[in-house]
């Protein structure tokens, strides 16, 4: 898929383990609220086991997948799925 019709998604920690990938390209445009459902269709169980506790960034800003209903992921955008981090 070319960058003119896709966006790049980066997976970190448990998201990377679950998908078996660090990055991949997905078709764009995609409404942000559909992101988790799209990933769930590709990786059954990921929504409940991983995504519900993750943060998501679009470009350099964190976004709320459920609340930001007007946000669209455009071709060439970069999205990151970021699981929670603990420190001690």
From Swiss-Prot:
The modification 1-thioglycine is found at residue 88. It is found in: Cytoplasm. C-terminal thiocarboxylation occurs in 2 steps, it is first acyl-adenylated (-COAMP) via the hesA/moeB/thiF part of uba4, then thiocarboxylated (-COSH) via the rhodanese domain of uba4. It comes from the Eukaryota. InterPro entries: Beta-grasp_dom_sf, MOCS2A, MOCS2A_euk, Mopterin_synth/thiamin_S_b, ThiS/MoaD-like. Pathway: Cofactor biosynthesis; molybdopterin biosynthesis. One of its GO terms (biological process) is Mo-molybdopterin cofactor biosynthetic process. GO terms for molecular function: molybdopterin synthase activity; nucleotide binding. The modification Glycyl adenylate is found at residue 88. CDD domains: Ubl_MoaD. GO terms for cellular component: molybdopterin adenylyltransferase complex; molybdopterin synthase complex. Keywords: Cytoplasm, Molybdenum cofactor biosynthesis, Nucleotide-binding, Phosphoprotein. Belongs to the MoaD family. MOCS2A subfamily. Heterotetramer; composed of 2 small (MOCS2A) and 2 large (MOCS2B) subunits. HAMAP family: MOCS2A (MF_03051). Acts as a sulfur carrier required for molybdopterin biosynthesis. Component of the molybdopterin synthase complex that catalyzes the conversion of precursor Z into molybdopterin by mediating the incorporation of 2 sulfur atoms into precursor Z to generate a dithiolene group. In the complex, serves as sulfur donor by being thiocarboxylated (-COSH) at its C-terminus by uba4. After interaction with MOCS2B, the sulfur is then transferred to precursor Z to form molybdopterin. This is Molybdopterin synthase sulfur carrier subunit. It comes from Aspergillus niger (strain ATCC MYA-4892 / CBS 513.88 / FGSC A1513).
